[in-house]
Amino acid sequence: MGTALSHFRTAPSSRGSGFEYGRAGLMSDVALELSPPIVDNGLSLVETDQVLPAERSEIVSRVLNVVIASLALVVLLPVIALVALAIRLTSRGPILYSQVRVGIDRRYRSKQEYDRRVYDHGGRLFKMYKFRSMRVDAEADGNAVWAQKSDPRTTVIGKFLRKARLDELPQLYNVIRGDMNIVGPRPERPTIFAQLRADIPLYAQRQRVKPGITGWAQINQAYDSCLDDVKLKVLYDLEYVSKQSLSHDIRIILMTLPVMLFRKGGW
């Protein structure tokens, strides 16, 4: 399922501990929060600290993301048109669906990340777009619910869109706007983000890079339908944050294609 996590770039903490992944048992107080132990895949959180994003040119990254997203929109325009038509013909409601998501949090650069305000969202909020794959009354009660691999709330065409990951195509527009990158941790809704930040140590440090349409966690792990699934994805997300590079992004983009074609992994 992926390689063991290693070579993290970290910052020293007040305790003087380091951040390391390996095959050893779960030993730190943070690791205890990740119980039951995740050892099946050779991944385990041994000791934690602040995970710092690997350095890379923001300008080059931005240009690359805009170019790829723009080209993808042009090439995939016929697919986008067919998907929009299929949604319109098979279910009532809008073609596009938007949700507020939690984006990048740059406060770690000024050491203000943990000087939280009362209504701290954990990152810059933005509106993320998707092709609608659920019934219009899927969340009529207003409560945010985790998406599942076989979600009963999805429409007939929505099931196919999710399996092929075509429902994510409108997020190419989010990339052009600067809300997201092609590659990065998947953004979460504010209510679910707040819950996960409270339950999972280091979860908020995923926000130190822009969220993405696809990511290292998505090509290595299936749909997260429970807290334990999210905990495993956090390991992959933090590895990406620490080792991000343009070459790694290209690799993940190429690895995403078979995930879409053969319906492996998950968003």
Predicted stretch roles:
Residues 230-241:
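Short helix/strand-capping connector loops at secondary-structure junctions
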Residues 134-135, 146-210, 253-256, 260:
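A short, structured surface patch at a secondary-structure boundary
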Residues 91, 226-229:
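Flexible acidic/glycine-rich loop/turn elements at helix↔coil and beta-strand↔loop transitions
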Residues 44-54, 136-141, 151-152:
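Short glycine/proline-rich turn/loop motifs
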Residues 1-74, 95, 240-242, 267:
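N-terminal hydrophobic signal-anchor/signal peptide
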Residues 52-136, 246, 251-267:
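A hydrophobic, helix-centered structural microdomain
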Residues 207-225:
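Long, charge-enriched, surface-exposed interaction segments in small proteins/subunits
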